[in-house]
Amino acid sequence: MFGLPRPVWLLGWVSLATDAATEAIYPLLPFFLTRVLGATALSLGIVEGAAEAVNSVIKIGSGSLADRSPSKRGLVLLGYSVSSIALPFIAITTSWPQVFTVRVLDRVGKGVRGAPRDAMLAVWTTPTTRGKVYGFHRGMDHLGAVIGPAIASAFLYFYPDHYRTLFALTIIPGAIAVALILLVPEPAPAPTSVESAVSRPVGPESADAGLRRRSSVDRQPSKGGLPREFTAFMLVLSLFTLGNSTDAFLLLKLTDVAGSTRWIPMMWSALHVVKATVSVVGGSWSDRIGRRAVIAIGWLVYAAVYVGFALSDSLPALLTWFLVYGFYFGFAEGTEKALVADLAPAERRGFAFGIYNAVQGLGALAASVVFGLIWKSYSAAAAFGLGGALALAATALLCVFVRPARLQLRDGTP
């Protein structure tokens, strides 16, 4: 269907089921932590930031292991199993450090599965469909994130304040995800970079005069056997992630302004409707007009949303900005992964995705803790303003240092 291989579809359904479980809980966590368990905004930042940092450390090892392991599917199965077992334990927590422990275990599972799963997806792509495949996968993630909060809202409508029961029931979609992984075939080993590396430019950017051949300096790998183009992108991405704090702060401000959690899960669901729609479009655009342009659009949207949250205290305005936020995810997330796959040799893609995920996670730790401190010490407006400014700076550097001439495909598929 849609020209995508069956394993891509199966992994998409796995992500849908897992996200349905995770996102049924996530939009309620800021309220649960701050109102039920008595945590502060700083504690919220520590919980979410540290969880993502642990996730990132695990992803470095899992990416390298995925390159060496004869069974990427085994790592994916292990990761999804850990998360599916850990997440429902939020139902019995009585303090924020306990939630912290559960969230860390959940993110350990995500860290184990992320890089090998992304490397598996790369096997079933071609240079012209890579953006579409990763965009589709993100779209299925977002679709699961639509279904989960919608079910949570319906459940809480009939059973008000039964948060713990809802959390416990997330074991059901988690079990479905684990069962589906068993149907995914183990991908064949990728060819070596000598056999697979090619120097074909991406899309219309090949029209630039400087794209005919790469210099001998550009051909040289950086540390870890990865090209310098990849390193440049990771450095720019690092700056962006320093302003990319946990989405829990957006939900916390919405909850504070709304004065209730009644509509928060539905708004989270609506956000993912936007994400799921735009991610497929963004992936296809990146195959046609180039990765850099689509990523830049997404980062600019992010900057606008954070500035909007800094300047607005009106609920209708915040709800509008919150929905616009979905365009950032739709344009940037899948396209960033497609660019990583473009720049990394086939036999190093697992490690490359591990580095990419590590940059994201470590940045989330720093961003979330700093955001929480600024919120507590100064104001929410100052914290959101800083995030927007860093996103603008990163976008400018992306356009300057990640040049079109550097976006070369390295593919291990015919």
PLM region spans:
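Transmembrane alpha-helix termini and helix-breaking/packing motifs in multi-pass membrane transporters
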Residues: 31-36, 147-167, 366-382
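Helix-loop boundary and gating motifs at the non-cytosolic
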Residues: 2-55, 230-267
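Symmetry-related core transmembrane helices of the 12-TM Major Facilitator Superfamily/SLC fold
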Residues: 164-182, 382-400
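Cytoplasmic helix-loop-helix junction between adjacent transmembrane helices
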Residues: 102-143, 339
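Helix-loop junctions on the cytosolic side of multi-pass membrane transporters
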Residues: 173, 181-194, 399-411
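Structural signature of the two symmetry-related core transmembrane helices
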Residues: 74-88, 171, 293-308, 388
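Helix-loop junctions at membrane interfaces in 12-TM secondary transporters
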Residues: 91-103, 310-321
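Helix-to-loop junctions at the C-terminal end of transmembrane segments
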Residues: 58-71, 156, 278-290, 375
